[in-house]
Amino acid sequence: MSTKFWLVVPAAGVGARMAADRPKQYLQVGGRCIIEHTLDCFLDHPDLLGAVVCLAVDDPYWPQLAVASDPRVRRAPGGRERADSVLAGLDALQAAGAGEQDWVLVHDAARPNLAREDLQRLLAVLADDPVGGLLAVPVRDTLKRADADGRVAQTVDRSQIWQAYTPQMFRLGALSQALRGALAAGVPITDEASALEWCGQSSRLVEGRADNLKITRPEDLAWLRQAWVERDRQR
């Protein structure tokens, strides 16, 4: 059975750590912007109902992209924090006809290497879940907790530690309520699952590929370009 879904992509950040002349989602790989590659995986999916990209009000790059004229993709104003942008996206979806019980996927604009199999697994595993969940990867490396002097204070048990990735998938109404409540309470929200966690809801972890990397630093971009060169050679 198919699982219909909406998409929100917060894309108002400037990506300062990339030290580039434009936000990282507009850097090019293979002749196209990162955000175009990011959206491809979702726009190719037959169960997508529509998408909202949350952008800086004065964003000069988005209108130049072909995807900006796709009728399935709407634009919403991004906020100061990620949670503000996602809320604006949810409001835009409701204005477009989305219901409170509809599934919404939130995905990072600079995470363009999402495998279609991972997207499909997420949708299948969470289709009947009472809360929702997210793609994640079990931590593989040894973790150290540091003291104030930058010395090892403790080795952390990694057996139950996962890295949170995106997409993250929740019901529209529940996610909106959780984000609004957490923001009103001044709770730091780093991803959508943390907002649900603050509300006492436990999100399901769905294991995905480790190469679903978020492009944050120059070395991430170099890795992505090389990985796609190797991928294209094998086709």
From Swiss-Prot:
One Pfam entry name: IspD
Coiled coil spans: none
Catalysed conversion reaction: 2-C-methyl-D-erythritol 4-phosphate + CTP + H(+) = 4-CDP-2-C-methyl-D-erythritol + diphosphate
Annotated site residues (Positions MEP for the nucleophilic attack) in this chain: 158, 214
Biological pathway: Isoprenoid biosynthesis; isopentenyl diphosphate biosynthesis via DXP pathway; isopentenyl diphosphate from 1-deoxy-D-xylulose 5-phosphate: step 2/6
InterPro entries, alphabetized: IspD (IPR001228), IspD/TarI (IPR034683), IspD/TarI_cytidylyltransf_bact (IPR050088), ISPD_synthase_CS (IPR018294), Nucleotide-diphossugar_trans (IPR029044)
PROSITE patterns xref list: ISPD
Keywords: Isoprene biosynthesis, Nucleotidyltransferase, Transferase
EC number: 2.7.7.60
Record site feature (Transition state stabilizer), residues: 17, 24
Single GO MF annotation: 2-C-methyl-D-erythritol 4-phosphate cytidylyltransferase activity
GO biological process: isopentenyl diphosphate biosynthetic process, methylerythritol 4-phosphate pathway
Function, in words: Catalyzes the formation of 4-diphosphocytidyl-2-C-methyl-D-erythritol from CTP and 2-C-methyl-D-erythritol 4-phosphate (MEP).
HAMAP family linked to this entry: IspD
Family: Belongs to the IspD/TarI cytidylyltransferase family. IspD subfamily.
Name recorded for this polypeptide: 2-C-methyl-D-erythritol 4-phosphate cytidylyltransferase
The gene coding this protein: ispD
